[in-house]
Amino acid sequence: MLQKVLLGLLAAVVALLLSPSVRFKFWNLNSEQENQKTDQNQTSFSDFEDLKRKIESITGKIIQMPNPRFIDSYLDSLSWTSNINIQTYELTEKNIKKHLKKLAEAGTQIRIMIENQKYQQYQNTFKQLQKEYAETPNIVIKSDQHMKTMYLHSKITLMDKSFWIQSSNLTHSTFAKNREHLFRSENPKILKNLTQLFEKDRSGKMLFRSDLHPNLVVCNINCREVITHLLSWAQHSIAIETQYLTDPQLFDILANQSEKLDLKMIFSNTESVSDLPSYFWNNKVRLMKKPYLHTKMILIDDEILLLGSMNLSANSLDNNREIWILINDPALIWEFEKSFAQDREKSNEM
């Protein structure tokens, strides 16, 4: 009797399982990885016109280095805020460190994220800052060791009502020796988004394309997609001023575009660019010796300017944390075009 009952129950269960009206939901034990796969299949922009429609017009100032006198203005920009969040590859400039200590002692809450194992590292700045600020209240230093990136190479400083995005580290060379570009803005949407990204990186949470404001280009999230599309979408001109070019995909795109449009590039006069092939003819490439070219700037069709921390290398695009911003302000673009022309005049033909 019991056997018949059990067989009957089993038959009922099987019938229920096979019923087309029954649906089952299986919980994903690794939803973060699934979200990442879905996110990677999305695109930021469908074409150049879509990009121009989606990005916001952002006002601000672009400051060109070297300019040793600007250090005072930079310090002043940090002075009137209750919170400072810094994400950088390097922080060694003594005046900035002293100023941060003074601000923290006066009550400003300061959080610093910095690379822990720099390429060709001569000193561990993370440990050095921990030591210097050990007795200073209101300063918290955190490395990138918990992040799923190779290098924390982004360079942003966030205050209560404004932010800096820059090509430069917070070093003496930035202000005294290097060609760098620093962008400051009070745009509240970008500031809010950068703060959210900072919090996610600080806590080790994964970033997705859906986390990003349309004007932000973040490695290793959407930067390869955005930069390859922009270079490919260019119709009239591309102007690049950056430290070097080593990424094969970007190289191929630029080589192809060089036959179709006005391509002008300025690189640092170092061994890393000596292997650029000779088919970049017609004076398309110039090499700058002084000041040392450390900036990372790209202008597409005189309409879209990219400024930030990313070098044109596979490591930067695919492995590092890098942050760029898309700028479409005609006045800021005109300023860059003017300085680019001046740098090109004093650079050597390849």
Where are these regions (language model features)?
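HKD-type phospholipase D/PLD-like phosphodiesterase module
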Residues: 21-82, 90-232, 248, 252, ...
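Hydrophobic alpha-helical membrane-insertion segments, chiefly the h-region
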Residues: 13-23
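N-terminal Sec-pathway targeting helices
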Residues: 1-13
